[in-house]
Amino acid sequence: MAGKLAVIGAGLMGAGIAQVSAQAGWEVVLRDVTDEALTRGTDGIKASYDKFVAKGKLEAHDADAALARITATTDLDAVADADVVVEAVFEKLEVKHEIFRALDKIVKDEAILASNTSAIPITKIAAATERPERVVGTHFFSPVPMMQLCELVRGYKTSDEALATARRFAESVGKTCIVVNRDVAGFVTTRLICALVVEAAKLQESGVASAEDIDLACKLGFGHAMGPLATADLTGVDILLHATNNIYTESQDEKFAAPESMRRMVDAGDIGRKSGQGFYKH
């Protein structure tokens, strides 16, 4: 499957989705609100292609062809004829509602409207449109070119046809899919990692064990490639705190009640690798 894809948001996730899709033969429109954001996104895509070429995993002419299939724009109307639209912006329902309302007015009827959200129920996002049956979750993982999984999420009104189209799209860009049949906040993967990170942070906060030993226990005891606190630093403590707060608000399940230490870290700006300090010093 290949066609025209629109990606809304040129950040790390949006650029990654655009990258793998263009490489798979999709014509991609990458849209963001500023030229600066688009430049950062397209520069990141080119740099990633260059790394794959240098490692012998991609031919230079294929990288050039993929780049040529990406059009960066601030014009939302440029996505009107897309077959698949993937929104990849900040995890805030109000922002997503604004985008989906706008897309609903301009995108052709047969297109699917997908969200890369990792935690917000698709049913809530779809409520901003007049076509909730065409709205589906396509949760990719970072870094998109390296991670194999795509979590497909069915909203309350998502049609079988829309879900099948989303699966064909994800598989066409090299991903293996799991299906979330009931879109509880956090779906499958975010609920699992948030529960693990929250418990690990509570253990560290209460002095049961150090961050290093907690992570080592998960790596050597459970075969995890990375421990939960190192994962939090990589993902961003702020992002995981935001996600677990969303899940807790929705579920009132105490295992998602983040410890005070995580809140204080975020307030202090100690959010992981991107700030130089999180559960570890970087």
Task: Show the residue positions of the predicted features.
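Rossmann-fold dinucleotide-binding core
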Residues: 115-182, 187-191
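NAD(P)-dependent Rossmann-like dehydrogenase/reductase catalytic/cofactor-binding core
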Residues: 161-164, 171-182, 201, 205-206, ...
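Structural/interface elements that position substrates and couple domains in central-metabolism enzymes
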Residues: 29, 172, 189, 193-199
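Rossmann-like NAD(P)-binding element
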Residues: 33-40, 51-113, 120
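NAD(P)+-binding Rossmann beta1-loop-alpha1 motif at the extreme N-terminus of oxidoreductases
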Residues: 1-51, 55
